[in-house]
């Protein structure tokens, strides 16, 4: 799998065998927490689609997911994500089903129905405690 940082607010995930790599379009670009969130969303979507394709006996070697996002304020955060599924070999009559399958990604569902967050400050460990 290869994650490519396309811009400060866009990534691309390509499937494939071998180790996962993270690449950038330029040396100045760094893998930000926003890229990480989008990578999780794209990887989950790619995984769900690959599993469906295997089950349906469809080739998925050319499947890729791009995720873009934009920010909103008060407070500053990601306001929306746009997922673009690129799958040139997918037959036209399977596109609607593939889109439904993509919507089953657990990461996407978690974002749509956010969990409760709890932040705790833990006490420092006692000196000499083992």
Listing of model-derived features with the role each one plays in the protein:
Residues 1-39, 49-130:
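Extended beta-strand/beta-hairpin segments
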Residues 44-45:
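Alpha-helical metal-binding/catalytic segments enriched in His/Glu/Asp
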